[in-house]
C-alpha cells in the first residue's frame, strides 16, 4: 500500500489572535486546556462518565469529517481510522449519522 509518514504532531489547532498573529499547537494541548477549564468550572461538583463525555466530543466530529472526506465510503473511512467497518457502522448509528 503506502507508507504513512504523518504522526500525531500533524494534528494541530491553528488560532488567530486579535493582533492577527497565527499560532499552532498540538490538538492534545487544546484538549488538555479544555479539560482543565471544564474541571475548574465544576466548583466541587462530582462528575461521572467524563471519559464518555470527552470521547463523544472528539469522536463525533472525527466521524463526520472522515465520512465527508471519504464521500460516505464506509469501507475507506474504517480503513483510515484503523477500525472494523462494523464498528464504524455502530459508531455512526450511535451519533445518528447512518
From Swiss-Prot:
UniProt keyword annotation of Transcription present: yes
Coiled-coil boundaries: none
SUPFAM superfamilies in UniProt: Homeodomain-like
Portion annotated as DNA-binding: 74-93
Domain of life: Bacteria
Xref: Gene3D superfamilies: Homeodomain-like (1.10.10.60)
GO MF assignments: DNA-binding transcription factor activity; sequence-specific DNA binding
Keyword vocabulary terms for this entry: Activator, DNA-binding, Transcription, Transcription regulation
Entry annotated with the keyword DNA-binding: yes
Subunit field text: Homodimer.
UniProt similarity note: Belongs to the transcriptional regulatory Fis family.
Function per UniProt: Activates ribosomal RNA transcription. Plays a direct role in upstream activation of rRNA promoters.
UniProt name for this protein: DNA-binding protein Fis
Organism the protein comes from: Vibrio cholerae serotype O1 (strain ATCC 39315 / El Tor Inaba N16961)
Lineage: Bacteria, Pseudomonadati, Pseudomonadota, Gammaproteobacteria, Vibrionales
